Design a protein with these regions (language model features):
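Short pre-active-site segment immediately N-terminal to redox-active cysteine/selenocysteine motifs
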Residues: 53-55, 59-63, 131
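A short beta-strand-turn-helix
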Residues: 31-54
């Protein structure tokens, strides 16, 4: 019995360690890419130097009740900011448990683009801490200004509004780093520097 509890604790801690976020508030992000599975084109690329928008991404799992509860609130945020320089994205993992991407959008009447993040889990692994829902806001320069699990609508709205205060200039990340490097390289460097690899 004691060995079982020890195994469960070790397993839980290893899962938490494996899902430690790579990017933290204050880090600069370059381009993000993904596949849109609903409410948009197939391929999505967000470049802070080109788009110069605030980006809000919510990472979720379809089977988790808190993610289901927040879906309509994200739609409200999307409608509140859709005519401003804000891009709102959902990033789903674990599709078909119980909803497919299309069923998710239909069930919760969502009109913002939804990424299929289940294969590479780029969004989930870059920003999350192993807990969903996980929400991030990145300002117009590519700086991560909000990163938190759970759902705190007013904090997210405040972060989005704060993101507008950043001037529309070239990303500091790209000025400081090699423009040919990508997030995968940055991801590997950060993991190594933090002792994960």
């Amino acid at each position: 019995m004691k060995a079982t509890h020890t195994f469960r604790l070790i397993y839980f801690l290893s899962i938490q360690f494996a899902h430690s976020q790579v990017f933290e508030v204050g880090d600069y992000i370059s381009d993000l890419v993904g596949n849109i599975c609903e409410n948009g084109n197939d391929d999505w690329k967000f470049s802070f130097d080109e788009n110069k928008k605030v980006l809000f991404i919510s990472s979720f799992a379809t089977w988790w009740k808190p993610c289901q509860s927040e879906a309509q609130t994200i739609e409200e945020i999307y409608k509140q900011f859709k005519d401003k320089d804000v891009e709102v994205m959902g990033a789903g993992i674990d599709w078909n448990q119980p909803y497919s991407c299309k069923e998710w959008a239909k069930k919760f009447q969502l009109t913002f683009p939804i990424l299929d993040d289940s294969k590479g889990r780029q969004i989930y692994n870059y920003f999350g801490d192993g807990i969903v829902p996980y929400n991030v806001v990145i300002d117009r320069s590519g700086k991560l200004i909000y990163s938190d699990s759970g759902f705190k609508k007013q904090d997210i709205v405040n972060a989005i509004e704060s993101g507008f205060k950043t001037p529309k200039t070239d990303s500091v990340y790209l000025k400081k780093k090699n423009p040919k490097s990508d997030n995968k390289t940055r991801y590997q460097i950060l993991r190594k520097n933090k002792g994960y690899d």
